[in-house]
């Protein structure tokens, strides 16, 4: 199921996703999505809820839902009223966590920590320890779509092992609510006061909001009683219209890659390649790692190349220098702590962008190196998996940490007025990254302040100097008082460039966007410096 939005708005520490007609806003809460409509004619707007519900262990029973309801009652959470008589949404499951007291504690979260051993076993059909993380929602900022999963992504909290969900426990549902939970109502108060009302059409047709159905079946609409028990049944007319999505049939495309001379180099690495998300083969990255420096830097590397290929060699050599400097004089940028050559860093940089289907010269770089390998008959050994993993994770986490800190800082309109020394390059990169994040979150309107640029620049300055991400986050947290930066970057340090599932896909997409934004401003700055 997909819900489209046009822009985002921060209101009372909640991220709201506003539709194109500005009459409806969504927000994520504990792996579920709430929808609130603009009040009209002194009447409250329609309130709806979308997401996964827990049901039972078979097609007919509701054992799991009853278990959750029973546990909520035993814990004295009488104010919590699951929607309907049979199903319980994921955000109610969150309340079984001892650290969560109300739905307000899990606002802006796409997943649910299930620490209850019995419930975790229901979800996975396996005994798990210490618990599992169940993800039901993904926000695709690039497409401006909130995606609700037909089947959740479930991973072990500690080992990140991925489980297959039990077949009957989860179902996708859509519910009409008479009101929001009491803990969430204050967060929505005054929301539409800051969103200009659209001009009403002359024909005054009833509004409708399309819900795109991408799964095998449409979710069953429910009329929530808001009391968790039997109530008076009444008919309701919803503004939501379910629309089935049918994939376009296309002919498969085949991507070509330069074959190296060594037969074992054409085989995918047995560990990394199987664990890697879809994208260009990792063996192509390994070719550049192994022979890229020689292909671009050797005095006779250009022999036998066409004029266009010679220009490409010069271009890649120049870009590696502009971004990362030289081995003897490295430039302050992402990946400063990695013991790699500028060409190797450039290859990883382009690979992380290219595998998310963004424009990148990575294929051209691979072709040049492949030509060099063939012309010189080089033997390319099997990929060094630890080296590739360390390189990709290092640059991936640096970029994701920088972008995540930018997102966190933009949540604060006012930051402490201090004079923090920041280098010109770090300041320029900070401004570019903040503008990119702002374009993904808010309507254009100058929400990036000099303080935002200064404090993100301070974070980048520590990172560019080769210090750790947590050290940079701690430094910035002390300057701003935003201690959540340390926790957020700690979460980034536990992520991997090879993570699968919705969370992994979202992290890869965001990282590619951050890398692309920084690449553009760095190359433009270097070009301007040359012209001056």
Curated annotation (Swiss-Prot):
Q: Where in the cell is it found?
A: Virion tegument; Host cytoplasm; Host nucleus
- Chief location category: virion
Which keywords are on file for this protein?
A: Host cytoplasm, Host nucleus, Virion, Virion tegument
Disulfide bond positions: none
Query: Mind telling me which GO cellular component terms the entry cites?
Result: host cell cytoplasm; host cell nucleus; viral tegument
Does the UniProt entry include the keyword Aminoacyl-tRNA synthetase? no
Compositionally biased residues, Pro residues: 257-276
Q: Domain of life, per the record?
A: Viruses
Q: Name one Pfam family in it.
A: Herpes_UL21
Annotated segments matching region Disordered: 251-276
| Role, per record | May participate in DNA packaging/capsid maturation events. Promotes efficient incorporation of tegument proteins UL46, UL49, and US3 into virions. May also play a role in capsid transport to the trans-Golgi network (TGN).
Family per UniProt? Belongs to the alphaherpesvirinae UL21 protein family.
Complex formation: Interacts (via C-terminus) with UL16.
What protein name does the entry list? Answer: Tegument protein UL21
State the organism named in the record: Human herpesvirus 2 (strain HG52) (HHV-2)
